[in-house]
């Protein structure tokens, strides 16, 4: 029985109760959200190391995903395992293995071993990889793709990205809508190239019921990928993007009827003035399915610092209702990220998600910020470290340049909170040291 099927029968599962406790909401709130398809809990029972269940969706905190995985040029399995550990250490709520080089099955197995949070994959990468190794990737058969999906389910993958909206009809819309950067989704591009070369429909769309059968068997959440997402501001919110979203909205309903959890992936390169519209359109067209976005990236020119630019767009999108942010790293658009890049990406996007939680009125986020302000006013450093999103970094910076006073070394004896409080408490004129 899937989480969705259990919820519809009125059952509160172990995972629902856990999510409710973590989120500070009632188990019934979570159950109702899962039953309605507004919340998903990616949870494949075959993922034995998964202990930190996550709820993604409306009424819950904004989540962050961290992508990792090998590439054609760089294959270092232990580095990818280290990336997974680093991502989880700094607060990633889920991780995705996007490996395209090396022994993909062995890499996935190693990452599953250390992933205490849900793990996602993009099965078409492996299906195309096998076909390319045999002859060329156009040689991939539909059966081969579904075989890979089944294998991922058996191994314990919790959610899979499937580019079901890249259909022949939507590719016609794309071809008649000139773009600056074309198709930038790797999985979507692979599927589109396969379809155009062979003149065949997307098997994930044509055989969607087969996909649902596999997903239901392993309770794999479907992350309906946006293969036609914009890859530049010039292409944002265009006809191809919206045409694909309309198709995805229809498939969300079919997944729900089949008892399969589904969330929807979104852009991408979107200017700030279009962020709200993109979130609202997605929610409207998909029956408020959880929205999992890449960024959003509000500028195309932040190469080397896309994690900062993406966090800006992600915070705004989260405020408007996006439910999970896929992080960007400093290496985005430039190369395969290192563990340090992963760390910086997770940090930036956890801050963005927290900012969105505050704006959405999340009670725990608001309370944490209130307590931090009180500790800061008291110059209670241990209290501040405990409440900081990243305590170790806060402590390191405080101790790196300490002060002779109780305050920090920026203001020292001139700390305004200290000075004014002293006067208000009747301590009178304070003697300040002369530098």
UniProtKB/Swiss-Prot annotation:
It holds the Pfam family ThiC_Rad_SAM. Its EC number is 4.1.99.17. One of its GO terms (biological process) is thiamine diphosphate biosynthetic process. Binds 1 [4Fe-4S] cluster per subunit. The cluster is coordinated with 3 cysteines and an exchangeable S-adenosyl-L-methionine. Zn(2+) binds at residues 269, 333. [4Fe-4S] cluster binds at residues 408, 411, 415. It catalyses: 5-amino-1-(5-phospho-beta-D-ribosyl)imidazole + S-adenosyl-L-methionine = 4-amino-2-methyl-5-(phosphooxymethyl)pyrimidine + CO + 5'-deoxyadenosine + formate + L-methionine + 3 H(+). It is an enzyme of class 4 (lyase). Pathway: Cofactor biosynthesis; thiamine diphosphate biosynthesis. It comes from the Bacteria. Substrate binds at residues 67, 96, 125, 163, 185-187, 226-229, 265, 292. One of its GO terms (molecular function) is zinc ion binding. Keywords: 4Fe-4S, Iron, Iron-sulfur, Lyase, Metal-binding, S-adenosyl-L-methionine, Thiamine biosynthesis, Zinc. Its cofactor is [4Fe-4S] cluster. InterPro entries: ThiC, ThiC/Bza_core_dom, ThiC/BzaA/B. Belongs to the ThiC family. Catalyzes the synthesis of the hydroxymethylpyrimidine phosphate (HMP-P) moiety of thiamine from aminoimidazole ribotide (AIR) in a radical S-adenosyl-L-methionine (SAM)-dependent reaction. PANTHER family: PHOSPHOMETHYLPYRIMIDINE SYNTHASE, CHLOROPLASTIC, THIAMINE BIOSYNTHESIS PROTEIN THIC. This is Phosphomethylpyrimidine synthase. It comes from Thermus thermophilus (strain ATCC 27634 / DSM 579 / HB8). The gene is thiC.
């Amino acid at each position: 029985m899937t989480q969705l099927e259990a919820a519809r029968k009125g059952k509160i599962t172990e995972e629902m109760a856990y999510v409710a406790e973590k989120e500070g909401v009632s188990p019934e709130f979570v159950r109702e959200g899962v039953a309605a398809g507004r919340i998903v809990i990616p949870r494949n029972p075959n993922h034995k190391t998964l202990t930190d269940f996550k709820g993604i969706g409306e009424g819950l905190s904004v989540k962050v995903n961290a992508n990792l995985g090998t590439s054609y040029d760089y294959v270092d399995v232990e580095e990818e395992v280290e990336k997974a550990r680093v991502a989880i250490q700094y607060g990633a709520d889920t991780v995705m293995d996007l490996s395209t080089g090396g022994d993909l099955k062995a890499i996935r197995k190693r990452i599953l071993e250390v992933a205490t949070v849900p793990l996602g994959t993009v099965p078409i990468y492996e299906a195309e990889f096998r076909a390319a190794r045999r002859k060329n990737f156009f040689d991939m058969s539909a059966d081969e793709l579904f075989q890979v999906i089944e294998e991922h389910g058996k191994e314990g993958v919790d959610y899979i990205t499937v580019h079901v909206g890249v259909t022949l009809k939507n590719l016609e819309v794309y071809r008649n809508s000139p773009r600056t950067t074309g198709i930038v989704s790797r999985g979507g591009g692979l599927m589109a190239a396969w379809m155009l070369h062979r003149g065949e429909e997307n098997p994930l769309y044509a055989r969607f019921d087969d996909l649902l059968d596999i997903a239901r068997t392993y309770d794999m959440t479907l992350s309906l990928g946006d293969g036609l997402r914009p890859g530049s501001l010039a292409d944002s919110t265009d006809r191809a993007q919206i045409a694909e979203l309309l198709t995805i909205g229809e498939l969300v309903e079919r997944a729900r009827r089949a008892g399969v959890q589904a969330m929807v992936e979104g852009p991408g390169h979107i200017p700030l003035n279009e962020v709200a519209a993109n979130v609202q359109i997605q929610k409207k067209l998909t029956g408020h399915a959880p929205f999992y976005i890449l960024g959003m990236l509000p500028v195309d020119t932040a190469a080397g610092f896309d994690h900062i630019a993406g966090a800006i767009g992600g915070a705004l999108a989260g405020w408007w209702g996006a439910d999970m942010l896929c992080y960007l790293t400093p290496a985005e658009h430039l190369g395969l990220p290192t563990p340090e890049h992963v760390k910086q990406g997770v940090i930036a996007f956890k801050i963005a998600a927290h900012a969105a939680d505050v704006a959405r009125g999340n009670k725990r986020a608001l309370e944490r910020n209130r307590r931090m302000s009180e500790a800061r006013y008291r110059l209670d450093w241990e209290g501040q470290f405990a409440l900081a999103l990243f305590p170790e970094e806060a402590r390191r910076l405080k101790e790196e340049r300490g002060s002779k006073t109780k305050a920090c070394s920026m203001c020292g004896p001139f700390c305004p909170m200290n000075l004014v409080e002293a006067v208000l408490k009747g301590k009178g004129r304070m003697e300040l040291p002369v530098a």
